[in-house]
Structure formats: structure tokens, C-alpha cells
Swiss-Prot record:
Mn(2+) binds at D150, E152, E221. Belongs to the DXR family. InterPro entries: DXP_reductoisomerase, DXP_reductoisomerase_C, DXP_reductoisomerase_N, DXPR_C, DXPR_C_sf, NAD(P)-bd_dom_sf. The keyword Metal-binding applies. This is 1-deoxy-D-xylulose 5-phosphate reductoisomerase. It comes from Corynebacterium glutamicum (strain R). Its cofactor is Mg(2+); Mn(2+).
Length: 392
């Protein structure tokens, strides 16, 4: 019997995760076949190139931005899917074994829900959709349907195979510390968007790089871990590991700790998610243990980087509180990039919006509840940003 290729749908094909996924698939064409791509539209020429190289029909290409979609449609000689729901529609109209959701931000929520509804495996790089959707999203998933792409959660999933659920004592989530590790809060008032865009060990998109600089990204990952692995936030430790070699660890009840180690590259977790639970040979180079290595670990400076402790509180609140955390951050991060607020004020905005969240956040029984909570959080965040901006 011949090898059966998996049909893969890639959402966010022009981003860092999407382009690396296409590289993995190109190197393993006997295992995978791309049946559709979706993108926001900031790089229409790249979408055109990808579609042509993959031999995709126009109706298997989705672009959210209308102007970019028109450019892509003309180049491909047919009408592509366009609009804010383009990725969701592509999922609903394309038969796939696995959907890689690498869209940026909570805009990926609709596509995540559509994937779960379709029955396809969800290779989830868009952590924001899980954080925003919370238990509403996980309640829609079949056992094992969501496969994490984040290197940390991929590492957790791999380490968890070393024991049973009741043998897990603690989860250890590692963080690089970002470009401002060791800085005081006072020093960070002078941080520029250009400085925040320079990550010491990972190559990521603009928003993920900024979220890593504030450690909001680690907060999102803590919340994500509670949802993916159905564990309490207090059982998750966060440690700063600047070398980004150990991606996460699991400590078991007998005192053993299992760690997943590999060079900082997303190709391994991407490949593993696409073919889970099987490993893809030579997904990336392995560590050379005959060479000298120094790995260090240190606690998070919560005074300088309060985002992690804030996320721990949010994870305990459950319901739509994580959606508030994410939505307020998206607005504050964008305001910082536009020069409207200072770097430390990003998390300050998130914190203040959360303090009033009891007035509008709660349990979500429908996706509209999540969207309404997000909308209110964004409105409150922007009102606060407007006040802060006038004082700069």
C-alpha cells in the first residue's frame, strides 16, 4: 500500500509560521499536499507566488483585504475568496485532514471554530483564538483534535507522553526573557518600537515579537496551557531560559523532570503538528551534544514584567476574562507601535481594563458573547489609550 498524503490547509500562509510550514511541506511532498491557503493581504505578490507554485485554483485561495484580493484574483485568472471571513469560508469549502491556523490575533477565532466543526485536525499556531475563545472553543473540540504548534506547548505534549495524567506534578513553561531581560521598568520607558522588534533568539512576526518583549506572549501561553492540558494555572511555573533550547518541561510525581530540547526553530513543532503523533525525519538539525553548552534558568522579574502574573490571575477567572486580556493587549500594542503610548503602558492598559472586566466579562455560551466581550474590552482600552496619549 502506498503512502497516503495528508491534505493541509494553511491559514496565514505569508507569515513566519506559514512560510516555514510551506518549506516543511516542500521538503516532504510525499507526506503532505497543500489544498488551500489564506492570508490577510499585506503581501499579495507572495500569495500569488505561493498559489502558482502550489498549483492552486483561485477558489482555494483566500485573502481578507479586498484591494489585495482583487490583485490576487487578476493574477490567478479567477475569483478568490475575499473579505474578513475569507479564511473561515475557505475552511468550510475545502476538504482537509489538517488545518494550520497561523493567522495573527483573535481574528483567527472564526477559522478555529470552523475547523473544529469540520472535523479536521487543528494545528494551532494562533494562540489568541484559543485564549479568546477559552472553554467555549475547547468544548467544541474532539479529544486530540487540537494540536499545538507553539514550541512550548508542542514540547509539553511531547513530554506528557512520558507519564500518565495523574503522574504530572508541575508544568514548566520556559521564556527567553525577550530583548529587555534584566531591564528595570524605569529604563523601559525609553524603549522604541524598533528595539522591541529585535528578539534575541526567535524570528517572528511584528506582533509576536512585541508580545515577547512585554512577556504578554508568555502570559497568553500560560492561559493556553491551562486550556489545552486542562490544568490549573498554579501548577504552571514560568522560568526565564535565555538560550531558548529547553522549550518546556514536565515534572512528574516521582521527582523526574522530562524536558524537550532543540535549537530555536519552529520547523520541528510545525512538522510534528502536521503529522502528529508521528515525527517527520530531518525536520530541523538536532543539537550537537559533543560541543560545549551552557543553559541557564532564572525567575521572571514580576515587577518589571507583570504580564505573566496578570495572566495567571486571568486564567483562574476563566470565562471570557482571557478574551479581555488578549483584546486589550492587541489595542495597546498597536498604540505603542504607532507611538501613542510608552512600552510599560501596554501592560498597564491591559491591567486597568481587566480591573473593570467584572462589569462585562463572564461565561460564554455563544461566539457572540466572546465577540461582545472583546468589543467592550477594545473600546475601554482605546478610551484609556486616548487619555494616556494626551499626556505624552
Amino acid at each position: 500500500m502506498g503512502v497516503v498524503t495528508k491534505k493541509i490547509l494553511i491559514l496565514g500562509s505569508t507569515g513566519s509560521i506559514g512560510t516555514q510550514a510551506l518549506d516543511v511541506i516542500a521538503d516532504n511532498s510525499d507526506k503532505f499536499e497543500v489544498v488551500g491557503i489564506a492570508a490577510g493581504g499585506s503581501q499579495p505578490d507572495l500569495v500569488i507566488s505561493q498559489a502558482q507554485q502550489l498549483g492552486l485554483a483561485a477558489d482555494k485561495v483566500a485573502v481578507a483585504d479586498a484591494q489585495a484580493a482583487a490583485v490576487v484574483s487578476k493574477a490567478l485568472g479567477g475569483e478568490i475568496i475575499s473579505g474578513t471571513d475569507a479564511a473561515k469560508i475557505l475552511v468550510e469549502t475545502t476538504k482537509a485532514d489538517t488545518v494550520l491556523n497561523a493567522l495573527v490575533g483573535s481574528l483567527g477565532l472564526a477559522a478555529t471554530l470552523a475547523t473544529l466543526e469540520s472535523g479536521a485536525h487543528l494545528a494551532l499556531a494562533n494562540k489568541e483564538s484559543l485564549v479568546a475563545g477559552g472553554e467555549f472553543v475547547t468544548s467544541k473540540a474532539k479529544l486530540g483534535q487540537i494540536i499545538p504548534v507553539d514550541s512550548e506547548h508542542s514540547a509539553m505534549a511531547q513530554c506528557l507522553r512520558s507519564g500518565t495524567r495523574d503522574e504530572v506534578a508541575r508544568i514548566v513553561l520556559t521564556a527567553s526573557g525577550g530583548p529587555f531581560r534584566g531591564w528595570t521598568r524605569e529604563k523601559m520607558w525609553e524603549v522604541t518600537p524598533e528595539q522591541a522588534a529585535a528578539h534575541p533568539t526567535w524570528a517572528m512576526g511584528q506582533m509576536n515579537t512585541l508580545n515577547s518583549a512585554t512577556l504578554i506572549n508568555k502570559g497568553l501561553e500560560l492561559i493556553e496551557a491551562t486550556l489545552l492540558f486542562e490544568t490549573d494555572a498554579d501548577l504552571i511555573d514560568v522560568t526565564v531560559h535565555p538560550q531558548s533550547i529547553i522549550h518546556s518541561m514536565i515534572t512528574f510525581t516521582d521527582g523526574a523532570t522530562i524536558a524537550q530540547a532543540s535549537p530555536p526553530s519552529m520547523k520541528l513543532p510545525i512538522a510534528l503538528a502536521l503529522d502528529w503523533p508521528h515525527r517527520v525525519p530531518k525536520a530541523q538539525p538536532a543539537l550537537d551534544f559533543t560541543a560545549a553548552h551552557t543553559w541557564t534558568f532564572e525567575p521572571v522579574d514580576d515587577a518589571a514584567f507583570p504580564a505573566v502574573q496578570l495572566a495567571r490571575h486571568v486564567a483562574k477567572q476563566k470565562g471570557t476574562y482571557p478574551a479581555v486580556y488578549n483584546a486589550a493587549n492587541e489595542e495597546a500594542a498597536e498604540a505603542f507601535l504607532r507611538g501613542r503610548i510608552k512600552f510599560p503602558q501596554i501592560v498597564d492598559v491591559v491591567d486597568e481594563v481587566l480591573q473593570g472586566a467584572s462589569q462585562f466579562a463572564g461565561v460564554a455560551s455563544h461566539v457572540d458573547d466572546i465577540l461582545a466581550t472583546e468589543s467592550e474590552a477594545r473600546a475601554r482600552a482605546n478610551a484609556l489609550i486616548n487619555r494616556l496619549a494626551t499626556n505624552l
